[in-house]
Amino acid sequence: MITVNVDLGDRAYPIHIGAGLIGRTELFAPHIKGSSVTIVTNTTVDPLYGDALRAALAPLGKRVSTVVLPDGEAYKNWETLNLIFDGLLTDHADRKTTLVALGGGVVGDMTGFAAACYMRGVPFIQVPTTLLSQVDSSVGGKTGINHPLGKNMIGAFYQPQAVIADIGALTTLPDRELAAGVAEVIKTGAIADAGFFDWIEANVEALNRREPAALAHAVKRSCEIKASVVAADEREGGLRAILNFGHTFGHAIEAGLGYGEWLHGEAVGCGMVMAGDLSVRLGLLDEASRQRLDAVIAAAHLPTRGPALGDARYMDLMRVDKKAEAGAIKFILLKRFGDTLITQAPDEAVFATLAQTTR
């Protein structure tokens, strides 16, 4: 087992990474202070790992209940969030009840948001079961739900007590979900660590094959980088925005097609292709680096052409973005691997990128 720490003073927490961690009682015990636990999971993950988690919690002598949500990005909304609150209230959960998010990014984001809101804040633990959630969404305290007009526009910054990332859970991931997670690994290397990007290029096939050593290193290094960024800028006042490379275009794709049509990581992968193209057009990135970026995204079996939503629709969707200010779209662009720029771009350049990178 590897442990990475997120250094946030009195709100610091560990990220435990390894195989078989869902069943290890001692990893949960220090973070559960009250007399009850509510597991929040979904219809896909509960049959796979719910019993193992409940068995791990049983020796603690807590009252354990489970809320099972429908599976998918399409359900990341108020109605599904209320199912969590319904379960908590029905079970008489109190301020010391610990929520445990067992699932991917949707489950983690909604459980964290529910924890932030219920009785104005109860503790929660992240147990991410997808590669995307292990390398990205479970770390850093971003929680929330989608709105029909924009992704993740309603939420809160609320840190977990711990992240327990069981890489053994990745063996049951569908191939599309695995590729979606590799997209966030590629993003992390591209924005923050040229050496890690080199490693991803050399090992993308090992990741595709789910080789445990490659997956463990990808999760570890991605978490180290994200933990460092979050410690420096917890609430996305500046530096943390670089983690949104590929997300401005990507979120527009998700909202434009309807949540769940493309997986989040698929949209981010394509969004990085689009952001790379725009980076070259603005004279920030060299063509050879853009080609390397596109090649590793394609090698991860991610889409490299965006849907033809139309220029006006893309622009409208990108203006509904957390980085936008007074309606001005901000992009995270590459200068070189490991070096980014947060900037606006002329509409003509964005239109040229859309013409080149959409169907």
From Swiss-Prot:
Molecular function GO terms recorded: 3-dehydroquinate synthase activity; metal ion binding; nucleotide binding
Localization annotation: Cytoplasm
Cofactor(s) in the UniProt record: Co(2+); Zn(2+); NAD(+)
Lineage: Bacteria, Pseudomonadati, Pseudomonadota, Betaproteobacteria, Burkholderiales
InterPro entries: Dehydroquinate_synthase, DHQ_synth_AroB, DHQ_synth_fam, DHQS/DOIS_N, DHQS_C
Originating species: Burkholderia cenocepacia (strain HI2424)
UniProt keyword annotation of NAD present: yes
Reactions catalysed: 7-phospho-2-dehydro-3-deoxy-D-arabino-heptonate = 3-dehydroquinate + phosphate
Entry similarity comment: Belongs to the sugar phosphate cyclases superfamily. Dehydroquinate synthase family.
Cofactor: how bound: Binds 1 divalent metal cation per subunit. Can use either Co(2+) or Zn(2+).
Alphabetical keyword list: Amino-acid biosynthesis, Aromatic amino acid biosynthesis, Cobalt, Cytoplasm, Lyase, Metal-binding, NAD, Nucleotide-binding, Zinc
EC id: 4.2.3.4
Record-linked HAMAP family: DHQ_synthase
Pathway: Metabolic intermediate biosynthesis; chorismate biosynthesis; chorismate from D-erythrose 4-phosphate and phosphoenolpyruvate: step 2/7
Role according to the record: Catalyzes the conversion of 3-deoxy-D-arabino-heptulosonate 7-phosphate (DAHP) to dehydroquinate (DHQ).
Keyword set includes tRNA-binding: no
Top class in the EC scheme: lyase
GO cellular component: cytoplasm
Protein name (database record): 3-dehydroquinate synthase
Annotated Zn(2+) binding sites: E184, H247, H264
